[in-house]
Amino acid sequence: MKIAFIGEAVSGFGGMETVIRDVITTFRQQHIQSEMFFFCRNDKMDKGWLEGIKYSCSFSNIRLGFLRRAKHIHALSKWLQEYQPDIVICIDVISCLFAAKARKKSGIDMPVFSWPHFSLDHKKHAEYITCADYHLAISSGIKQQMINRGVAESTINVIFNPVETKDSVIPAPEEGETATFIYVGRMKFEGQKRVKDLLDGLSQAKGNWKLHVLGDGSDFEKCQAYGRELNIDDRIVWYGWQQYPWELVQQDIEKVSALLLTSSFEGFPMTLLEALSWGIPCISADCVSGPADIIQPDVNGHLYQPGDIAGFVTLLNKYIAGEIHIEHEKIPASIDEFYQSKYYDRLHKVIISAISRRK
């Protein structure tokens, strides 16, 4: 079987790239051939994450949108004729349009899947999702967004995203030790990640706490400055971007009370799954989409309404005071359906079903 993954150029540093790379690597082990095709304006895409993956690119910096699209569609149709895939999986919504048009132009009949990794409510051209035949939703929230745009529910499969099982658990601080929180992600002061809410909440929390921040982004210095403004900077350790953040958490931080996520929206926050796979509970905004699929209150963490700083502070205070007792050793079992073996079983069945229906 041959699979084509297509999409616009990506940054190369996010959770989406990690998932795509892992899926292609696993498919290769199952003797499923995969190649990628990117639509690019220039050659600036970081390609480090594509090591070992065969890929092609269509370049166009034509300013007129319809001409730029026509060039990409022509390039894709030629590539499809050469590669002859059994299935096309689009990693973003605009690619669904390109794939549908290129399929027609190439004369090759193969099923087209959408596999968007971001909330459709916060993406341009989300209506093009309907150009795909079938849909892989990474969260229940994204499934609903697809339905809201006219996609038939029968064509949608919620597959989530996979996480590796771990061979150890990161413990909580002992009673009497300082509560230790971590944030692992991009530095966006407001916008999607709302690190401002995280800092505001901690500044109002009672008792002793420490925050370790692993991540970089356009607002890194702004977030640091705000920490100083709130007079909490002496309790925050800023690490910047880390290639292996969880190794740093395990080896240097050692004990963690909870991971914090204060986003206004997500696609499917892998940072929650990673934390839980290490036995770390999570305090997360119940934003669209993903956290509600992952977090089970009192079992592996807690949810609060996005923007409800008072609700966030209440949870922080309970964790700091030791009023919440979640056994870290039991947390990894709470995300059993997200581990790789079950994920690939789901994905394989969906793909085989689509191909057999097409024949």
Swiss-Prot record:
UDP binds at residues 242, 274. Signal peptide: none annotated. Pfam families: Glyco_transf_4, Glycos_transf_1. It comes from the Bacteria. It is an enzyme of class 2 (transferase). Keywords: Glycosyltransferase, Lipopolysaccharide biosynthesis, Transferase. Pathway: Bacterial outer membrane biogenesis; LPS core biosynthesis. Belongs to the glycosyltransferase group 1 family. Glycosyltransferase 4 subfamily. Galactosyltransferase involved in the biosynthesis of the core oligosaccharide region of lipopolysaccharide (LPS). Catalyzes the addition of galactose from UDP-galactose to the first glucose residue of the LPS outer core. Cannot use other sugar donors, such as UDP-glucose, UDP-glucuronic acid, UDP-galacuronic acid, GDP-mannose, ADP-glucose and GDP-glucose. In the absence of a lipid acceptor, can hydrolyze UDP-galactose to UDP and galactose. This is Lipopolysaccharide 1,6-galactosyltransferase. It comes from Escherichia coli (strain K12).
